[in-house]
Amino acid sequence: MLLENGWLVDARHVPSPHHDCRPEDEKPTLLVVHNISLPPGEFGGPWIDALFTGTIDPDAHPFFAEIAHLALSADCLIRRDGEVVQYVPFDKRAWHAGVSMYQGRERCNDFSIGIELEGTDTTPYTDAQYEKLVAVTQTLIGRYPAIADNITGHSDIAPERKTDPGPAFDWSRFHAMLTTSSDKEIT
């Protein structure tokens, strides 16, 4: 995958207003894996894009009334079919982590990139999602090498608030695919 000005060239771009600048001289050193489905447990549809762009209709579903006021975004979403949607360029600070801490450092949004997988904690993720997550991760490691040793779940940086990506996310599979992909890049 190619990067241009912080954007994945092959992703669908849906710019979110919910971001700002990282602190001065701060580069991404952490990748946070999340999940999202809107309405909860349902896949497809325009609702994730609408949430991350601040345009979700609070009357379209009872749950949306609870979240319509939120100003949040992820850097990217990987849909069930493997489509990659990017909301925030990687050099900017997306608002995905909330109150969080990683290895003693607070405010993970300052130094992380957030990737949402369309899914739930208990619904197995698709092959296409793992493949695209590996491809995006490899691209990010190429640009921000420190990420290679710092990939975690939202539940690990905000354990009292969050459970995603949940037990359905196969970390062993992801790491094996990432290692295999890295080996192919080298040879």
From Swiss-Prot:
GO CC terms of this entry: cytoplasm
NCBIfam families, sorted: PRK11789.1 (NF008758)
Enzyme class, UniProt record, top EC level: hydrolase
The name this protein goes by in its record: 1,6-anhydro-N-acetylmuramyl-L-alanine amidase AmpD
Catalytic activity of the protein: Hydrolyzes the link between N-acetylmuramoyl residues and L-amino acid residues in certain cell-wall glycopeptides
Metal-binding keyword on record: yes
Record: residues binding Zn(2+): 34, 154, 164
Residues spanning the membrane: none
Protein role: Involved in cell wall peptidoglycan recycling. Specifically cleaves the amide bond between the lactyl group of N-acetylmuramic acid and the alpha-amino group of the L-alanine in degradation products containing an anhydro N-acetylmuramyl moiety.
Entry similarity comment: Belongs to the N-acetylmuramoyl-L-alanine amidase 2 family.
Keyword annotations of the record: Cell wall biogenesis/degradation, Cytoplasm, Hydrolase, Metal-binding, Zinc
N-acetylmuramoyl-L-alanine amidase domain boundaries: 29-167
PANTHER family in the cross-refs: 1,6-ANHYDRO-N-ACETYLMURAMYL-L-ALANINE AMIDASE AMPD (PTHR30417:SF4), N-ACETYLMURAMOYL-L-ALANINE AMIDASE AMID (PTHR30417)
Metal-binding found in the keyword field: yes
E.C. number(s) listed in UniProt: 3.5.1.28
InterPro entries: Amidase/PGRP_sf (IPR036505), Amidase_domain (IPR002502), NAMLAA_amidase_2 (IPR051206)
Pfam families linked: Amidase_2 (PF01510)
GO BP annotations listed: cell wall organization; peptidoglycan catabolic process; peptidoglycan turnover
Location in the cell: Cytoplasm
Needed co-factor(s): Zn(2+)
